[in-house]
Amino acid sequence: NGGGVPINSPDEFRMIWEVSRPLLVRTYAGTKNIPQLAKIYEETINISWHALSLWWFNKLDGRGPLDVYTTLKEHIETMKFIAATNKPLEPNIPHHFAFRGADDVTYIVSAYLAAKLSKKMGIRTLILQNMLNTPRSTWGIQDLAKSRAMLKLVKGLEDQNFKVLLQPRAGLD
């Protein structure tokens, strides 16, 4: 659900960056060595903002080799690195719950927890993604209600050192 292109080396990232000029280039997530990947993204494509899935893409969902605890440790280390770059972070956790049939409360709570952790790790700009029509049975008023609740809770964390930008996007489901 979501696709992607396998890129196998820093040289391939550099090649993509060079042929993409002047477009913005970014990447989504990895399944292991997350801190090292974040550094590669900075060095090769000058990533505009980082995206992390925190506790997905591991043994829990069958998409990676790590256990959940190790995945979280790697992501927390990566968040500290991202904070040092002063780049935004997009924690794209909620829609992964939605893909797996979770309700809107789980969606909203996971967004809030990811935002709170991001702030604690020193992230200054959070990109709050809200994937609409996920699951596909939702639409319109339901999406607006979910967005408003999520935005109200997460924006409550804002201060002079932490800003939240809403990124609504079409669903992939």
Predicted regions span which residues?
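Catalytic alpha/beta active-site cores
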Residues: 1-115, 119-125, 129-131
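Short, surface-exposed basic-aromatic patches at helix termini and helix-loop junctions that form
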Residues: 40-44, 145-149, 159
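Flexible, glycine- and charge-enriched loops at secondary-structure boundaries
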Residues: 68, 104, 140-147
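Generic multipass alpha-helical transmembrane bundles of integral membrane proteins
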Residues: 132-143, 164
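Conserved, mostly hydrophobic/aromatic
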Residues: 154
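Flexible, glycine/charged-enriched surface loops at secondary-structure junctions
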Residues: 158-166
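Extended amphipathic alpha-helical segments with heptad-repeat/coiled-coil character used for oligomerization
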Residues: 168-173
